[in-house]
Amino acid sequence: KTFPELDPTQIPMAHPVKEEKVFYLLDPGGASRRSAGLKVVDKLARGLRWMLPYEEHAVELPYIPEFLKKEDGLLLSIGQFNQWVGNQLMGSGLVQIWPGTPVDSPLVEEGQVEGVRLVDQGTDRQGNPDTGYMPGMDIRAGLTVVGDGPIGPVGRQLDEEFGLPEGHHQREWAVGMKMVVDLPEDCALEPGTVIHTFGYPEPEIFGFMYVYPERVASLGIFVPSWMDSPVRTSYRYLQHWMMHPALWRYLEGGSMRSWGAKTLQESGMRGEPRLVGDGFARIGEGSGSTNVLTGSGVDEAWTTGVLLAEGVIELYKEGKPFTQKNLDKAYVRRRRQSWVEHEGHEAAQARDGFQRGFLSGLIGMGLTGLTRGVINLPGRSKPPHARVPSLETFYRGKISAQEIEELRARAAAEGTSVHDALMARVGWDEIPYDGKLLLSQQDALLVGGKVQAPPGYADHVVFLYPSLCENCDNKLCIEVCSGEAITSAEDGGVPEFDREKCVHCGACVWNCTQPREEGSERGNIEFRAGAGGLHSAEN
């Protein structure tokens, strides 16, 4: 609707959806953590494989529910799409875009947002003035539109300043990690193919693969906060997922083009912040627009921006200021009457069942989707730091507490994460690096398209209270870090941070197991504005 005369061929990598497949992936190696109920499901699937669409340790679902179908949709590289949109906007002469300009904070004066302040430049890593120091510029405006995503510093500061609406929370998260790859020449997948998976490498991890023209594919996994594991290593899990026989038959012989990761806000409408206030409005994923039933967020985020634009034009024509009252009428009312709101309400409780377990979650999603939100499976959410057990509890009966302590001490001495040793100990195979598609995490940083962090800026990942880190025996921030930018300190205290490796995914923020104060739902890690770390233009 925004581009009624759009020719998809103008956008690099765009292609209409042609075919959809959903696979339930069984564990081919026996290392996956599966409940008793899921083991029964797996046994039945293998026992009845002669009558099921079973192949390569996977069952293809014969029916895809309407709420999961992507037909009539368009496969896009968001990076390429954003560049294309940016060119359209700049070409209009009405908009300026300042890429690579980190915004430090909102300017809040007497309860009203007057604009934003850019980060200081010419500082040391602690933010102290250094050579070429220049304080951050203040940019003032009648209306500040905040669309900096779920872990953006401006949006999070507004949440702290004004609070979330009563009854709302932001407890469900996921880290999405993906690659763009060149498929092997003999790959049989056609452009427009959409593949979704669930069940492996751990039951809670969902996967996807989208095939673009010229044998290029985007593929990846989502690791959710309700996966109650202290070993949330997205990169290693991504490699195990790719090597599942049902997928490896398409990928073997391919090569990585680019790689990246980002945090997703999975609370849906219940994570909606205050959408407007005097001088500001919220749009996009950080405004609670993601549909947690269909797992879609791009169309919804885009539409929130369109709705705000319509409201702003209305107020401008009427000569009215951008007050909370006026924005409520012009924007929020439009949003409440939109398809985003309607479908978001239907989906609001879709994932509550996952609070009870994986199978309960699948049943709950099915009930919500098939009844359009009338029937839901209830579940009680918890803050992320209240969900994660200790390593000793998680591996009880498999690895002794003494051995875990030895592995932990060795990892601290080597400045590495402990997940590789733990996963090997419980039966996960080593990754057979091939230098093309299966790369070490550090090699992926080098060839995956990451933008390096320039000097002259303060570190953007900050451990607020050292004592909390020193008393933490489960440094999940190290295990989950997408770029291995957070590593163990020699003394086992405050982790070390190397911003050259940071991909700005924000996973450390919601994986911190130490609340910054009693009763707080926020951890001890603060994610501030910073330069560099962005993904390649196609990822």
Where are these regions (language model features)?
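C-terminal auxiliary extensions adjacent to catalytic cores
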Residues: 354-431
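Iron-sulfur cluster-binding cysteine motifs and their immediate structural context
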Residues: 472-500, 507-537
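FAD-binding beta-loop-beta segment adjacent to the flavin cofactor pocket
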Residues: 261-292, 444-456, 467-480, 487
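C-terminal catalytic lobe of FAD-dependent flavoproteins
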Residues: 220, 228-254, 270-304, 309-315, ...
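Active-site-proximal substrate-binding core of FAD-dependent oxidoreductases
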Residues: 288-294, 306, 310-361, 496-498, ...
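Helix-loop-beta segment of a Rossmann-like dinucleotide-binding subdomain
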Residues: 51-82, 87, 222-224
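Predominantly flavin-linked oxidoreductase catalytic cores and closely associated redox partners
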Residues: 77-249, 307
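N-terminal FAD cofactor-binding segment of flavoenzymes
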Residues: 1-52
